[in-house]
């Protein structure tokens, strides 16, 4: 790395992200091409973006880092072309692209030249989607048309204090100003829109990206994410049954060495998504959650066990990513139905359809563990046998059926007294809602003790390692 790159924030971020001494800069001599509005008199070293390649824990990655000291990091024609060139090289080599964003927007002096070059970058990103992992980190401003860049990538991180992400500025939204709701903040973009996967300090973000890169395959055909497992494959998870409410904790218990890389942690907390390791293999995990516990074992948030529109879309996008990169999927199902609210009713049917389609369309190994309730169409949506799960396990106290047994008894025996309803509810639960009943019908493969979950899911994924599954010939789905 040249002195220019090493001495400013953009270069320091690259040095902190990559293995020491591994970065090689490309296009360091490029400058702005336009001469309009006296641009030739302005210094534009590297045209405001450092581009090149290096390694993270030995894995090849391509990186671009915007330099806010050059025209405030504003994007011009050559700036965008440099990033596009990095994408071309990454696609040839089958390696991830990481973008470190700190930008004031498009250069007005370059107008359509900048727009054309940046439009081509959108196209490069679109073609790279599902082929190589794309990761964005926002350290400064990412506004207007640039906000499409993180939306086109797979994972986005945002500096908690200085990061700003918006399509329209908060003050440009009718009836709003930044004092009412800072729609550009890391909190809003991570908790409300779900566009941001993680927030924190600059150091935290770079560390999270390093961890994520090590969990992911380098492209959709080759997988360098496998590693030796030193954890006991048959390890008993004695307290796993007590963690079924907060499945982020449950997934941590199941994983090799308790490694869990959660994504979109602050968004739609009723649904958990992230990556775990099972026998050294990266597995994508999707799980319903009814409670969120903090490090002091205190309840931070509580949900009713239903599937929300936001949660369904969050899970659907994650499953589609896993399928694109041949990452097996594990689900922990504990769902009582669909969330009933005016907000959810606007989108729940479409959101549930997207999740159903994502599971049904995925050809990767899919394993489901029913850890609690599994009622109605929401259960079917959550990676059931019906939509394509390869293996389904259930804990002994799971309930699988149309609805809660008490509700079913009240509907079927509406005129009966309370004692009769209790009797019929117990009968209904035994005949229609027990895991044994589902297993007799072939909807559950094996009833397992909660403590043995780790060894069973590892065994299932080992068995499914060479899975091959065909799909009807078509250009693409339309859900």
Residue map of PLM features:
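Ligand-binding clefts of soluble mixed alpha/beta catalytic domains
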Residues: 1-479
């Amino acid at each position: 790395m040249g002195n220019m790159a090493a001495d400013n924030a953009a270069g320091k971020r690259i040095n902190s992200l990559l293995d020491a001494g591994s970065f090689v800069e490309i296009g360091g001599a490029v400058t702005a091409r336009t001469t309009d509005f006296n641009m030739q008199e302005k210094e534009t070293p590297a045209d405001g973006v450092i581009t090149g390649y290096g390694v993270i824990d030995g894995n090849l990655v391509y990186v671009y880092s915007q330099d806010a000291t050059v025209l405030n990091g504003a994007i011009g024609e050559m700036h965008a072309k440099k990033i596009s060139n990095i994408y071309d090289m990454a696609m040839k080599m089958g390696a991830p692209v990481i973008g470190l964003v700190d930008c004031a927007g498009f250069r007005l002096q370059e107008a359509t030249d900048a727009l054309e070059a940046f439009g081509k970058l959108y196209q490069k990103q679109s073609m790279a989607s599902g082929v190589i992992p794309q990761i964005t980190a926002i350290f400064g401003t990412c506004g207007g048309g640039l906000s499409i860049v993180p939306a086109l990538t797979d994972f986005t991180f945002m500096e908690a204090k200085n990061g700003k992400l918006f399509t329209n500025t908060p003050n440009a939204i009718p009836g709003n100003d930044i004092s009412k709701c800072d729609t550009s903040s890391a909190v809003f973009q991570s908790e409300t829109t779900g566009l941001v996967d993680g927030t924190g300090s600059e150091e935290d973000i770079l560390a999270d990206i390093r961890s994520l890169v090590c969990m992911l395959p380098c492209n959709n055909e080759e997988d360098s994410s496998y590693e030796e497992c030193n954890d006991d494959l048959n390890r008993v998870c004695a307290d796993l049954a007590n963690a079924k409410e907060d499945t982020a904790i449950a997934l941590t218990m199941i994983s090799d060495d308790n490694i869990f890389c959660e994504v979109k942690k602050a968004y739609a907390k009723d649904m958990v998504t992230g990556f775990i390791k099972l026998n050294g293999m990266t597995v994508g995990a999707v799980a319903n959650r009814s409670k969120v516990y903090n490090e002091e074992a205190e309840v931070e948030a509580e949900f009713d066990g239903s599937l929300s529109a936001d949660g369904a879309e969050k899970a659907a996008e994650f499953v589609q990513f896993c399928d694109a990169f041949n990452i097996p999927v594990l689900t922990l199902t504990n769902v009582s139905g669909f969330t009933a609210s005016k907000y959810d009713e606007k989108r729940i049917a479409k959101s549930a359809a997207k999740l159903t389609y994502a599971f049904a369309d995925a050809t990767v190994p899919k394993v489901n563990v029913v850890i609690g309730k599994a009622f109605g169409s929401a259960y079917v949506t959550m990676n059931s046998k019906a939509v394509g799960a390869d293996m389904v396990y259930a804990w002994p106290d799971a309930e699988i059926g149309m609805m809660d047994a008490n509700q079913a008894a009240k509907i079927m025996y509406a005129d009966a007294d309370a004692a009769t309803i209790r009797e019929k509810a117990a009968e209904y639960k035994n005949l229609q809602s027990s895991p044994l009943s589902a297993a007799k019908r072939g909807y559950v493969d094996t009833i397992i003790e909660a403590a043995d979950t780790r060894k069973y899911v590892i065994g299932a994924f080992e068995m499914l390692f060479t899975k091959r599954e065909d799909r009807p010939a078509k250009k693409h789905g339309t859900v």
